[in-house]
């Protein structure tokens, strides 16, 4: 019993220490207001961005949700912050939450865009498309199938022996590859131009094509690259999603997400084939030829 208490104490202590690694700002007085489809959270320094962002969010809501034929079950939280010298956006699709850093980002590899319109549409497209692709809803982000085998125990006072085999197989609740997640979020919806294909993006893709260095279909499925590699996952994903929309209709992006929501579907190659009639690898080859 003492041993169990000790282990529990270590667990609680570890959780407490982990919490100390993060930081907050207790001096900030957060405020919230509601729109038809969003809860907007801000403080004095971000109120202007929050009110403009709320307008943008409501303007793009019908377009993004119509593309995927899906609306979040509850109002999506959008948090506007500007604590640090930092620009970004993040979508937590299992929490139905978006964080927006209010400072505009002018990224050399993507040209100039209107920041709030771009980042809010991008992150909300993540929320909608990835929730559409979930296999078991928002309450079950994943599971493990596990099997344990124990040694035979000879002593009658011991219930079972020491574990000698462990099989653990993950069952993710969402299996959208990075190129599709980011590519569809940059595509946004038909007619959107907040994150358009500009000369900067074209330069990156053209350079890879001319040097026979296009990311393969497999390479597009992962991040963790060096140099411009991670940006090329975004860039190639945007180009491929645009190719899909142009050749099979924007609805094909939704159909791919629908196929990936099938609890037994874990192959992007097969999901694309179900949605478009051609396999993912064949579609990629056609995309490569078009470049």
Where are these regions (language model features)?
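Juxtacatalytic substrate-recognition/specificity segment
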Residues: 19-170
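Acidic/His/Gly-enriched intrinsically disordered linker/tail segments
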Residues: 25, 95, 115-119, 131-291
């Amino acid at each position: 019993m003492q041993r169990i208490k000790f282990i529990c104490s270590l667990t609680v202590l570890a959780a407490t220490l982990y919490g100390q690694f993060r930081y907050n700002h207790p001096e900030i007085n957060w405020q919230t207001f509601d729109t038809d489809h969003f809860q907007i959270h801000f403080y004095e320094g971000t109120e202007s961005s929050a009110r403009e962002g709320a307008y943008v969010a409501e303007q793009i809501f019908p377009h993004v949700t119509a593309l995927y034929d899906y609306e979040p079950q509850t109002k999506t939280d959008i948090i506007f912050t500007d604590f640090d010298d930092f620009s970004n956006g993040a979508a937590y699709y299992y929490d139905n939450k978006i964080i927006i850093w209010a400072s505009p980002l002018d990224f050399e590899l993507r040209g100039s865009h209107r920041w709030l319109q771009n980042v809010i549409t991008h992150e909300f497209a993540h929320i909608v498309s990835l929730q559409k692709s979930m296999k078991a809803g928002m309450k079950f982000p994943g599971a493990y199938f596990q099997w344990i085998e124990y040694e035979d125990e000879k002593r009658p006072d011991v219930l079972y022996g020491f574990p000698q085999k462990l099989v653990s197989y993950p069952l993710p609740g969402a299996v959208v590859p990075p190129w599709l997640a980011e590519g569809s979020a940059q595509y946004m919806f038909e007619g959107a131009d907040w994150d358009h294909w500009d000369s900067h993006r074209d330069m990156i893709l053209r350079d890879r094509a001319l040097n026979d260095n296009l990311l393969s279909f497999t390479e597009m499925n992962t991040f963790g690259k060096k140099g411009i590699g991670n940006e090329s996952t975004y860039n190639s994903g945007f180009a491929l999603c645009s190719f899909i929309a142009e050749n099979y209709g924007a609805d094909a992006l939704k159909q791919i997400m629908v196929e990936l929501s099938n609890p037994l579907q874990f192959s992007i190659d097969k999901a694309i084939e179900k949605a478009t009639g051609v396999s993912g690898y064949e579609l990629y080859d056609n995309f490569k030829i078009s470049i």
